């Protein structure tokens, strides 16, 4: 069966046999900045942002297996925590950490359910969407030989064809944010991501929300699009069969925001220091010196490629 990419993408990631429901979880295929020592540096940066904004709790939207939530606790964040994802509560989370099972993609959990899991009002919380928007399925379109923008359809083996013309709000979005009439050019229509992000702000009403992701802005849109697949640490052909992650970069400038900063700027403003510790500490406290070196290494990883180029899209709820 051949269907629009957006529908196939949703089923491949979040359906009953979807990639994000697999027992090994995403970490079985790739790591993100939420893992290991880098995850603790990211957590410290988020704690700094929460402190500046007055947020008392944190909700991790697209929480995976709870890696960032665990990192937040490990760096001393004492406020309420809750995670939202498509799987049941992961083993090993601290007992006081809330968990919500959601449908996945742009289908959000009910705000009352999230509030109950967090144990405090969402208006006092920071919602973190780390690499969530890039896996919110969106319409994949391509300009045909006549200059018309048409949906790209795909079958279970990844074979594509051009389908119906893009119309309505989706076409309006493309004309405003990603205009092109070059035959063969691709457009990943970000309307679904814009709407999902707006729903987080308008339905959940957090004190602040931050979307941390890779993406592009007007003038840097890739003419061939960015749809990609990852499996077992490798880039593979995008096939919507549930065996691989499917992702596309985010049109950052179309998202509602109060501020957009780079990942590197976020670390410099709110995160741990990347300055080497005094070498004299190695003689008086060797273990502390080694721990400080590890912290600096993690901070420098966040400052460098690729995480330093990620965007932090910050908005009030």
Predicted regions and their residues:
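Rossmann-like AdoMet
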Residues: 1-104, 108-122, 141, 279, ...
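Short, solvent-exposed beta-strand-terminating loops
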Residues: 6, 10, 135, 218-223
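Active-site flanking residues adjacent to catalytic metal/cofactor-binding acidic residues
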Residues: 59, 84, 127-130, 212
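Short, solvent-exposed loop/turn segments at secondary-structure junctions
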Residues: 89, 133-134, 215-217
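A short SAM/SAH-binding and catalytic strip from SAM-dependent methyltransferases
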Residues: 105-108, 115-116, 122-142, 187-191, ...
